[in-house]
Amino acid sequence: MTEAATSLKRTLVGRVVSNKMDKTVTVLIENRVKHPLYGKYVVRSKKYHAHDEANQYNEGDKVEITESRPLSRTKSWVVSRLLEAARVI
C-alpha cells in the first residue's frame, strides 16, 4: 500500500463515552462551527461506533479513530491509537 492510499482515510479525534459493547467503543466527536447569521460559535457533536479489538480503551480516553470498511451495520471506524488516558479519580 502506498502513502497516497493511506492518507485518503479520514481520521477524527474524540473521547470514548461508552465501552460496554464487546470489541466496540462509542466515540464522541465535537466540532466548533460558526453560526452563519449570528457569528456565535456552536459546538456540534456526533457519536461514532469504533472497533476496539482488545477491549483496551476506557470511558474518558482521548482516542484517534480511522475510517475503514464496514465492520457491522453501525461500525465503520477503527480506533487507531490512544492520545490521552482518562484520569482516575
Curated annotation (Swiss-Prot):
GO terms for cellular component: cytosolic small ribosomal subunit. Keywords: Ribonucleoprotein, Ribosomal protein, RNA-binding, rRNA-binding. Pfam families: Ribosomal_S17. The keyword ATP-binding does not apply. GO terms for biological process: translation. CDD domains: Ribosomal_uS17. InterPro entries: NA-bd_OB-fold (IPR012340), Ribosomal_uS17 (IPR000266), Ribosomal_uS17_bact/chlr (IPR019984), Ribosomal_uS17_CS (IPR019979). GO terms for molecular function: rRNA binding; structural constituent of ribosome. Disulfide bonds: none annotated. One of the primary rRNA binding proteins, it binds specifically to the 5'-end of 16S ribosomal RNA. Belongs to the universal ribosomal protein uS17 family. Part of the 30S ribosomal subunit. This is Small ribosomal subunit protein uS17. The gene is rpsQ.
